[in-house]
């Protein structure tokens, strides 16, 4: 390949991206005591940077991670993490979906929300959470895992 516009370079980039994504996801799945792989998609943020910060705040929240371990689609903990991110957010515009099912919007639970399909989704090993801030066009995707009793067992059983 001698030119930056060589189509083979695009093929290589796509293949390299696929390998890097797979490796990154394997690291998350291999977290100490992890049982669930969680994809958090944030949309409607003020910017891509804001969306990423919000996604990381959700993904790194011990309260969210323990709720995930328990199979609890606790939207209040997700809203708390959004607020802690320090980015622009409006509770009355916020929408939250778990496993493709809208569970909260405009500051409260969705009317007529059926928890059964969400509970089935939360019982699985691959969890999807979508947050729509309804403010702008910023988007981001973050991967995380749950936080289980096994994590405590692993990290509480040795000294350095």
Q: Residues of each region from the PLM?
A:
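A structural signal for small-residue-enriched, beta-sheet-centric alpha/beta enzyme cores
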Residues: 1-160
